[in-house]
């Protein structure tokens, strides 16, 4: 799990950032352990949530955002994957992406294309930062997400 939070921004948006981090971690548990999502949420609550809250110096996540992210993930996964396939360069195939890379791109697509609650540039910056923390290669994430925006 992530423990490098140096480039996570100030407290006023930490609840949203924490919710996105929690979603990434819960989805990883869900896929890695091949367990139902509700079990992964319970595992996360028991073992990881407290650490995240302490690291970001907050008392609670933005539970509405976390619920929106998780509830819409499985519902729209095929649409997310189609958008990913259509926006990868010719040299890349979706199967080449790791679990966290793929989930971060899926979540960012949800917020950019379906949720549309926050400013698009803010969403891109947030997910590029998260991609960098979890996977490295922020330039890949930035280029990919800008391609997604241009394809609208």
Describe the predicted segments one by one.
Residues 1-152:
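N-terminal interaction/assembly modules
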């Amino acid at each position: 799990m992530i423990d490098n939070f140096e480039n996570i921004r100030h407290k006023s948006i930490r609840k949203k950032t924490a919710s996105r981090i929690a979603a990434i971690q819960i989805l990883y548990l869900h896929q890695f352990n091949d367990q139902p999502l509700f079990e992964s949420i319970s595992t996360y609550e028991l073992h990881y949530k407290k650490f995240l809250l302490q690291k970001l110096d907050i008392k609670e996540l933005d539970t509405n955002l976390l619920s929106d992210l998780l509830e819409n993930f499985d519902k729209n996964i095929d649409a997310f994957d189609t958008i990913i396939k259509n926006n990868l360069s010719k040299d890349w195939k979706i199967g080449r992406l790791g679990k966290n890379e793929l989930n971060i791109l899926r979540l960012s697509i949800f917020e950019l294309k379906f949720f549309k609650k926050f400013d698009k540039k803010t969403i891109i910056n947030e997910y590029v930062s998260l991609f960098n923390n979890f996977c490295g290669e922020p330039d890949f994430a930035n280029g990919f997400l800008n391609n997604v925006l241009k394809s609208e």
